[in-house]
A protein has these predicted regions:
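Donor/substrate-binding cores of folate-linked one-carbon enzymes
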Residues: 1-64
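Internal anion-binding site segments
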Residues: 59-169
Length: 169
C-alpha cells in the first residue's frame, strides 16, 4: 500500500484473496494472513527491482472495527449458539462456573438440541450448553489457573451435575 495522509486510504500495489471457512479462529486466520503477506511481500520486492507497478486506488470505503473488549468476550448464554460460536472464534471467550473463570477455547453449534430443550440458558447436559437459541457443544476449555483440556476431561474433573449452569456467578 502506498502511504497516504488518511487512515487506510493509500493506493494498493498488490493484494491476495484469502479464503476463510466458518470455523477458522482468529489465531488461525492471523497465521494464514502472515504467511500470505510474507509471500506477497517477497514476490513484490523481487518485481520491484525492475520497478514497482503503478498502484491501483482502493475500492469502496475503509471498514473500521472497534477494539474488542474483555466484556465483548464474555459468553452471555441468552444469545444464540451461532452468535456464541462467533465469540469463541475470536479467542479468550469466557464464562464462569462455581465462581471461577472458564475460558472456552473451542466450541461448535450442536446439531442435537433435544438434550437441552426446555432448559435455562447456561444449563449443562454433558458437553452441551443450552443457549437462547440452540445448543453449543463445548470441545476445549481452560479452567482458571489450569492448562487447556477437552470439555469431557473438565466435566469429569468438576463432576458437573446435569442441569448445573454456567455463567451464574
Amino acid at each position: 500500500m502506498k502511504i497516504d495522509a488518511g487512515l487506510d486510504t493509500g493506493a494498493v500495489y498488490a493484494m491476495r484473496t484469502v479464503p476463510m471457512d466458518d470455523d477458522v479462529t482468529l489465531e488461525e486466520l492471523r497465521a494464514r494472513l502472515v504467511e500470505v503477506a510474507c509471500t506477497l511481500l517477497v514476490d513484490e520486492l523481487a518485481h520491484g527491482l525492475a520497478g514497482l507497478p503503478e498502484p491501483e486506488p482502493q475500492r469502496g470505503q475503509p471498514t473500521i472495527a472497534e477494539k474488542i473488549s474483555r466484556e465483548d468476550l464474555h459468553l452471555d448464554w441468552s444469545r444464540t449458539a451461532v452468535e456464541l460460536k462467533r465469540v469463541v472464534r475470536l479467542g479468550h471467550a469466557w464464562t464462569t462456573f462455581r465462581g471461577k473463570r472458564l475460558t472456552v477455547l473451542e466450541a461448535a453449534v450442536a446439531a442435537e438440541e433435544s438434550r437441552t430443550d426446555g432448559r435455562r440458558p447456561g444449563a449443562l447436559a454433558g458437553t452441551l450448553v443450552a443457549t437462547g437459541g440452540g445448543s453449543l457443544e463445548l470441545r476445549r476449555v481452560q479452567p482458571e489457573s489450569r492448562s487447556p483440556m477437552s470439555a469431557d476431561e473438565w466435566l469429569r474433573g468438576v463432576r458437573a451435575g446435569d442441569g448445573e449452569r454456567l455463567g451464574t456467578d
